[in-house]
Amino acid sequence: MNYEGHLKGHRGWVTSLACPQQAGSYIKVVSTSRDGTVISWKANPDRHSVDSDYGLPNHRLEGHTGFVSCVSLAHATDYALTASWDRSIRMWDLRNGQCQRKFLKHTKDVLAVAFSPDDRLIVSAGRDNVIRVWNVAGECMHEFLRDGHEDWVSSICFSPSLEHPIVVSGSWDNTIKVWNVNGGKCERTLKGHSNYVSTVTVSPDGSLCASGGKDGAALLWDLSTGEQLFKINVESPINQIGFSPNRFWMCVATERSLSVYDLESKAVIAELTPDGAKPSECISIAWSADGNTLYSGHKDNLIRVWSISDAE
């Protein structure tokens, strides 16, 4: 993979990234930061010239009064959700950068938020240990309390299946839980980590779940059975994992490295370091919808951009 350049605009750690799913979107990526802002980025026409930033801010979304921890983009519209340590979730219109709605019920920092595959439901979680399901009008419809997590919920995502809406959550209680959205029932609890879980993600076809955290183990699970399929020891606390949308690859961001694994061979196929330098710690990643670009967010406030060469 090739290093293409960076996006510069945040004044704090880049905590979360998301790429639009619509083909041909003029927005390339949306980022959140500990500076309390959200930025939507467009391509820079001069990005290939020397010393030019790869992208330019399209809108800077301001309004949160704490660190912004997570962003999720609607699949079919120009809306974004953000979660913040100010205990709120906000919905934004990316076309004009305006906040459309606030979601208020969490009693502590909100760490994770996600749109459902059909954009009709929203799920959120954080340091009050409670997973909440909302409609897009801002009404809290369910709280997953029975068989819930016993510590902070750090990561949450939907499975892409519309027929059987499933939510997967990862927690500081060292477990992953799989939830039936309609009934609010915990279908299974996945145990395999020896320390807190910081990231969970579901594969594009909905069959696999990957999890990672403080123990430095990336675990791959069969989502339908709960069986642990295999484990990759990366020997450094894991910040985020992201499946490629169209290759059998998985990107793992840790305190020490940013690596892409081939899931069939379980081998590293790319160690991502710009120009041979040791970059700042990567804490967030996102693949473009076509799988040809990877964005990484770092503690030096920059977003780095990587492209897949034709040979790959």
UniProtKB/Swiss-Prot annotation:
Q: Which UniProt keywords apply?
A: Repeat, Ribonucleoprotein, Ribosomal protein, WD repeat
UniProt xrefs under Gene3D superfamilies: YVTN repeat-like/Quinoprotein amine dehydrogenase
| Stored SMART domains | WD40
Spans of repeat WD: 9-42, 63-93, 105-135, 148-180, 192-222, 233-262, 279-307
Among InterPro entries, the record links this protein to: G-protein_beta_WD-40_rep (IPR020472), RACK1-like (IPR045223), WD40/YVTN_repeat-like_dom_sf (IPR015943), WD40_repeat_CS (IPR019775), WD40_repeat_dom_sf (IPR036322), WD40_rpt (IPR001680)
Q: Highest taxon of the source?
A: Eukaryota
This entry's Gene Ontology molecular function terms read:
ribosome binding; translation regulator activity
A GO CC annotation recorded here is: ribosome
Q: List the disulfide bonds.
A: none
Q: Which PANTHER family match?
A: RECEPTOR FOR ACTIVATED PROTEIN KINASE C RACK1 (PTHR19868)
- Family that this chain belongs to: Belongs to the WD repeat G protein beta family. Ribosomal protein RACK1 subfamily.
Q: What is this protein called?
A: Small ribosomal subunit protein RACK1
Q: Which organism is it from?
A: Leishmania major
